[in-house]
């Protein structure tokens, strides 16, 4: 809570995307929001700051860029940057301006924000897990499965359509080249090689996370620049082929303008 203004359960929730997928992280956040574990502000903070691509997809990105030998460096750099950016974004608009109200409309109190003191944390975690497992029955399993299926169905159509349109715009129109022109001086100031060639790729990630790396792969781009674009793509978090659509389809109050 001191770093990210979030409750302790966000620690597990924040890692969910790293080990699975952004949409899974969003789904888990939505379930915690339904259970009054998060307020509007806390739920939106977790959605927009921690729904990072999975460790497996990091492998896809470095493979597309031809920098497989830098996989560990890409993951560690992205991991650190994600938490640094999250600590900043949680304290600035629009996240800082969201209400600290739960799903039922009740306002979070100062007592709610006080962390519980737990002795022997590992033992307590094991006992809580055992107790929780005893509550599981077939009806709960089917209800959760149905929620996951309907949630997936909502975003699949967007994933396919947005990815196709974004790829067509990136590969067959000069749109992103024009949009990337103001970025060239910034990249040159940072002394990043091939500034003009990679500038369009810095913006196209909002449509599809892998598209920036696809755009620059096989074009003789310096390894440093490929590393930069790969990390930038992963920490950008919000992309409309998956994470952004999952966020908009969740019950947590969020708008396109917020994203």
Language model feature labels by segment:
Residues 54, 77-91, 155-168:
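Hydrophobic core segments of alpha-helical transmembrane domains in multi-pass membrane transport
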Residues 14-24, 172-176, 200-211, 234-240:
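Short helix-coil transition sites and intra-membrane helix breaks within transmembrane domains
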Residues 38-71, 75-87, 209-259:
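C-terminal transmembrane helix pair
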Residues 25-26, 85, 162, 166, ...:
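Alpha-helical transmembrane segments of polytopic integral membrane proteins
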Residues 2-51, 217-224:
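Hydrophobic transmembrane alpha-helices that form the pore/transport pathway of multi-pass ion
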